[in-house]
UniProtKB/Swiss-Prot annotation:
Keywords: Cytoplasm, Glycosyltransferase, Nucleus, Repeat, TPR repeat, Transferase. The keyword Lipid metabolism does not apply. InterPro entries: OGT, OGT/SEC/SPY_C, TPR-like_helical_dom_sf, TPR_rpt. TPR repeats lie at residues 38-71, 113-146, 176-209, 288-321, 613-646, 648-680. This is UDP-N-acetylglucosamine--peptide N-acetylglucosaminyltransferase.
Amino acid sequence: MVALMDKIAQLFRNKQYSDLIQLIDKQLHAKNEPEALIFLYAIQGEISFKQKDWIQAFAAYEKAVAESKQKGLPTQVYAQIVQRQMIILLRLQMLDTAFGLFSENQSVSVDNVQVLAQLALLYLMCERYSEAEKLLSSIVESSTSNTITLSKQFKEDIGPFKELFGVLDTYDTFLATILNNLAICNSKLGNHTLAFDQFQQALDIIKDPEKITRPPLSPITVLFDNCVSTVDEDKEKALKVEHHMLTINESKENQEDDTVLSLLRDGCTLIPSSTLGTHLPLIIELHSTICYNIGKLELTLGNLDRSVNHFKKSIEYQPSFARYVALGLVYRDMRNFYDAAEMLTKAVDSCVGISNLCLGEVVYNLGILVSEELKMPYKSLQFFDEATVLFIRGEFSAGAILSRIMKANSLTTITTATAVSSDWEFIMAFLNTLYLDLCAFSKDQGFNVEAAFTGTNAISFNLPITEPQEKESPKSDKIASEKPLVESNPGRSRTPSSMNDVYMLSAENLSFSLLESSFAQKETITSRLFPTFQAETKRYLAILYTNLGLIYYRIGIPTYYKQARRCFEVAIWFDNDCVFAINYLSVLLLKENSKTLAIEGLLKCTRLFPEYYEPFYNLGNILKADEENKKALQYYSRAIELNPRFLDGYLARGVLYAELHRFETAYLDFSKCIELDPDNRHAFCNYIHMKQILGIFHNDTLDMRKISKIIDDYIHEYLTVQNAINKGVVLPSHPLPPIMPYHCYLYRLSSSQLRFICQRYSEQNVNWVKQNIDMMSTPLLDLSIHQRPMPPSIGLINSVSSSSQLQLSMLPLNQSAADSMVPLAMLTPGPTLCTAIGFQSIKSVIRDSQHITHGPIFSYDRALITLARSKHSSKCPISYIDIVNLKSPLRLGVLCDDINSIPIGCILESWLRNIDPKVASLSIYSTVASDKSALRTSLEAHCSNFIDFTNYKYQNNPFLCAQRINGDGICIMISMCQHNCGLEGRILAMRPAPIQISYWTHGGTTNSNYLDYILADQYCIPPGYAHLYSEHVITMPGCFICPSHSMHYSNAILLEEHADILKVTVEEVRSLIQDSKPDIDVNHHSAAGENILSLDGSDATSSSVDSGIGSRTHSEAPIGGGDKDEGAHSSKILELELELAEIAKMKGETKNGVSTNSASEGRDELLMNDRILITGDNVFFQVQPIRNGRLVGGRDRSMIKKMEPLLKAIYPLQRIASEAAVPASMEKSENNSDLTSHRVCLELPLYRKNIRALYGIPANCFLFCTFNQVYKFDMGTLGIIAALLRSVPNAYYALLKFPPASQLHIEAFFRHKAPDILDRVIFLSMLPMKVEHIRRYLAVDVFVDTLKCNGSTIVLDALWSGVPVVGFVGEYILSRKTLSFLSVLECKDLICASQGEAVLLCTRLAVDSGYYFSVRKRILKNRSNLFNISRWCDNFVLTMMLAYKNWIFGGKPTSFSTERVIANVKSQGFSWPLKSTGAQ
């Protein structure tokens, strides 16, 4: 008998089951003892159990139990047989029978404790946690009180059954297992603290096993290449399957009954079993399993770090599929994606015994992780292929289709980057096949998509999606009324935050672990896809269609938007609450100008699923476009709150913060973007720009190199795409460069890189016009009312107007899309040139606008003169002026995107006041809304044709804006906009005017074909630099910038203050300035007086005309006192009489017979005819000086509040001392005891030392300054500051808090690099009043400009104040403006070739007083060369006429110099006056 049992055990050990079955059958027919029969039946049941022959196994075990009644079985063996029977009944879904294995109301005793442990396990599997906890607690109590007896029971010899069941439990392992299961029960019941204690007790009972040395984890790159081994034949079958029936006849080994498994989803516990293989110690598996379960409990409580530690320890004891997956999912939740991918790859490599569905889902999650998070779409393809095969093996077609869709997404990403023709053909065919397969699969599920959509227009999400486009763009009132911060929907336990998260495995899919060899080990990872598909088939199909539609949309080709929309509509048809489909469909509706529907759809998303972040982001974009910035920030922040890793949300919010000048906050958002994706180009470039604005200069060199590398990579990608497009491949449009054209001049890029960036933006504008031109249907305008100004008829126009250069034939309206971009141009119906616009026929008015090659400056006046003389005899020569003058004023237009700013606004105001309207009329087109400032109000009042394109009539629509410009008959459009691909660029790309000129604001070339000229001077763009510009260069006389200082700040700094600085008399200063008296046409300034900012109350216009710019006449005494004894008494007293009580009652009333309405009509109460302000950081209020009587014109009590700080600010002036006393007092009116009237007296001038006292600057120091914005700084600028302060002992350096947040960063830089000079760096606040800013230059000795971007108005302010400016020179206009200013002032010696040379020059100015004073005198003497508005405007109008004449006579754009044209004409004996219409 012993020999027989040994033979049977050997066959069982060697898994020779066939021979063993034959032997058992033979022995069962023989006569055997009861002990032998029990063993034979147990062996027969074990073999059937391993072969999953459940009925045969249960029958064998039943016979073994029956035989045991005659011959008793050891307790451990009986417990194992009962466990097997329980497992079989669970497999057969016979729960009641399983519970029948145990006697009812059986009390716990030493004899039945092991069997009752199986009953407790059954309670756990059925989620009857309270009953399981009660029974397990009794087992623990009984076990601990009968330790000796139980120990003997576990040491009982079980004979041959030891070979059958392996190593059985000891008392310690049994008790540790019971405690583990009891801890699981308490965890499920919410007693987490007790559960932790019981887990720890279980670990304390069993001794810590000796650690096993294991090989380290393989590198991630190796793991990706060697992950899942799949037969190539299976892959080929999967790829060739047609439509939805993705089936394959594979072996179903390891395939479990999913219905039974659902009963065990969270009841996975330790089974008190001895089935552990003999090759591993039982103690190791117990430790590993308990550590895993502790990690699961920590994960449930949200302690990710602790969970990772326990999972790692579990894997260290005994690695397994479930433990690798658990650790990988935790790493993914911690955003440690590389480690997560490594763990999931390890899990796939250890997938022995795992079902195809479970393994396929893990591989699918690995593919999503690699594609979306690691940004390695090429690597993800193998995972999606493998997942497809596994789902096919598991007969889960819906999972296979989802995996194929995600593969298509990865292929699209790869193909977009490579732009290979064959790849695009493949992906398009693959997507079409996917769509057909998905439709067929839907049909098999009972949903005929094609039939449902035949004859229907769209599927609504409770909204009329197919509603026609609205004519007017809707406002965002509905969004503003919504509250973005809403509570989560309590009806759903887990709402996905993104579409990829819908069916991804998570911590919820992890269960407490069983022993490694247990039947239910695979259920430690519960499936998510298959149960969801079974429970919510329509919702699952909606997600499939949404994923497919999103791929079509992300391709970026407009022709595929229709297919994307169809997919989204089908998804909504399946699930009307599919927020993902509604969100993306709303985005498409925005592209189709269905704004109202889009907003309603997005708002529905926020109501259905408040945890979904993308609708909040899209609503934020809409609000931002509508300039609802505060609300947009709320929606962006809500999106980021819902998804803290939402890079686009941080990027959009950072851009908006930057536009709102909240630079520190923007910097933090861009820093977060870099943290999330260090390779994101747009995020990095915005991050670097914020660093420059804030003065953060660490790693500056590396940053510039990286930006250059980014642009090089971008150029390479763009050229690759363009080559493919040129070969006929249909590709999505390549995105714009990550740097704005204006900013690219700040990053030390090469000339070719700069030109390429600008060209891309220009191309984008042109392409936008091409794509959208057919959408408009505006009728033609009446030709008769849009005539251009023309020269007198001299027999020349008729021949020119009929020439081939201007005669434009009408082309068919349905011109192909391949035609070149069509500008708005001039039609030539007759001798008088006219224009017409009709968007249906714009393509028929193409004008040849190609630029000729740049060459030497060409003066075309000789050709004009020749043409004129050829038509007349020598006896009656024609004067050149007849050719120049027009029958009506030249119509100039200015397109401006920053008209509210002081520099541009002041320039335009000076044009309006100094250009003779009889010679040229000026129209202003603003693309920014009014800020209600006095400057904007003045411009709108004085410009006869001021158009605000933000008005509802134009809706920021480029077509409507271009139509208005063209309809106004503008001859020359002057662009004062930064080069962009927004509204301004699109307007210019349509060529609403025949001549378009770039002026000043961009700072370099636009590299476009729709801007003909760039306005410059001989210093900004000398002939040797013309090749850097695509535009033709118009060289103006003098400086190309028009400084308006002489009009706006006539005598902001008084003669006495100049004399004090130069240490000369007032008469010498007056003589110095009067020597440079310009030749000014007084008529041009007839209306300028009311806008001049004067300190003494005099009329600044007459002052500048009669006695030189900046001087003051003897005839006009300042307010508050005469000028009778000017040599002895140089101070001027300004008296301000303020009616603090009565002023509020004067609205519409009269006082002392004087009407108040006429004085204040149409003007700001605080901005009267003459203006005065008091110097000091705390005084920002403008007050009208009183000549006669009391102040009138106040309108409400708010004016009183504005006056109060002014009065209070007078008191600090009492502490300012000067050689002549500077009294400041507030005197109470003797006749008014109730303080209703006050008189304020302030002595002027204040002189340098008093100005310095106000700003906290040492009185006797030598003050350098750089008042440019900090983004213009670089490391060289900071190096100059440090070098100057070290080389000049008594020097201080003043910087502006421009922006305020930059101060901390610059101070930190000097504290680290040059702490010895930090206390001599002074930071001054920005002043809201320009005159006060100019007066602050009284405290400055030398202004040091910046190299990479020169200052503009800030440098002109310094020069107007007489402060020497040390400048640099670069390549483009942006870095050559200071050269132009100083050259006109005959101060070229202040231009430096290097920063080292600048330090030497500045040092010389500081130590050589003779040289310093000579420079200041030279600036004052020559400043009329730079600041003469009248002369500049005359030259400007003349230049515009020359450009227009060139076009009139059929000439193509060509570079020319106005000065040389005039000189050439005069050399021919012709005169050159400008005649107005009336003079002819």
